Amino acid sequence: MTIDELQKIVYNAGIVGAGGAGFPTHRKFSDKVEQIVVNAAECEPLMMVDHHLLEFHLAEIVEALNILCDTMNAKEVLIGIKGKNMHLLDEKVVRSLKGTRVKIKEIPDVYPAGDEVVLTYETTGKIIPEGAIPVMVGVMVINVETVFNIYKALKNASPVTEKYITIGGDIPEDITVVAPIGMKIKDLLTSVGYGNLDGKEVVNGGPMMGKLVDIENDTVTKTTKGLLIFPTTHGIIQRMKQPVNVSMKRASAACCNCTMCTDMCPRYLLGYNLEVHKTVRAASHGEVLNTESFLQNALCCGCGVCSVIACQQGLFPSKLSMEIKGALGKYGLRRENNVQPESVREVRASRLVSSNKLIDRLGIGKYVKPSVKKIDTVFNPDTIYIELKQHVGKPATATVKAGDKVKCGDVVALTAYEDLGTVMHASVNGTVKQVTDRFVIIGK
């Protein structure tokens, strides 16, 4: 198989990054890739999707990785997994990997171990240059579920029509489900018995980097990995609800210029010239001509360590940094003085944030269950809303119209292959009820 053939298979299957922003996976394949790094870190607390896939589908994942390795002529595959999760791996499969290109690489139980810059360093020892992507150092980083989707596309020509999701938080039993893409999140939670949300809010994603769910309108997408339920009064919810202008006002009133937000920043500790305290200072004091203090936020990964762990004043620097980063992207502003760090900072090892410390600081220890059950419920929603923008790049354009009959797996929208985007498929059998500028709506 050639790289071009692999790219077209993965594009046609609608595969995007399942654990992050949804970057179209076919665009990552390159003959410049020397090492494939699999993100099995399960970076944020309470998330369990990767656990289940590694426990029950490791053989399939390894098979797909070998195909990727052969196609790109990569030298090795490194599956980055925390030591505490090694017991999940099938011993027979692990033994079969000895002497092969696929290696299990133990990484520390710290946050954010799943950030691609951190993960690349922990697995390969390489530091990705500022403002660059992993392939610049010969690395491709890929999520566990994404690899599993590639396996299904290669073996069965199966497109992405469903999503593995952990449902957890302030509920009696955490579960992992496989839900059709486009199902209303409200309907999904109701179907598994967690539809009563009086006095509670739902987070799409982890407790650090997730977003609040609009429970009446939000749907399952290709990047939905976790739905966490917390009381409305919980600190996680209050942090996510705080408007960025309030964060700026609080910073101007309460920031003590201690620099702890910079000192604890995972990217700074890897040698990046990202000094969060300078952004807080410039924004709160209106230093609009201090351009570097704003442009440097292009290097921020939004992990939230500065907000949750570092700041002793209860400020949220990461909220400000990500707001600025979004504005930089919107207006096409780039930081031109990016450099290649020569080494990590000497203090890095002493400033890593353990998962246990993070759980304690977030106040979610009581929500950590001893096990998470995978349930095999087959969901049968009356209506599906296939969002046209579930990925990085251009939105997909509908290829169907109201009244068209579709089957699960049929193409309903796509972004042209030459553009950055992907293909959308029906996740149920039914009839197209409506096509809007945001959704293809399918009903029975």
Which residues does each predicted region cover?
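Ferredoxin-type iron-sulfur electron-transfer modules in oxidoreductases and energy-metabolism complexes
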Residues: 230-252, 262, 267-344, 381
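Hydrophobic alpha-helical positions that pack around
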Residues: 75-187, 191-198, 206-207, 231
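Conserved hydrophobic positions within beta-strands
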Residues: 430-432
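Short beta-strand-turn/beta-hairpin segments enriched in glycine/proline and small hydrophobics
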Residues: 373-394, 415, 421-426
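Extended boundary segments
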Residues: 126-129, 143, 335-378, 440-441
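Gly-rich Lys/Arg/Thr-decorated short loops/hinges at beta-loop-alpha junctions or inter-strand turns
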Residues: 38-50, 171
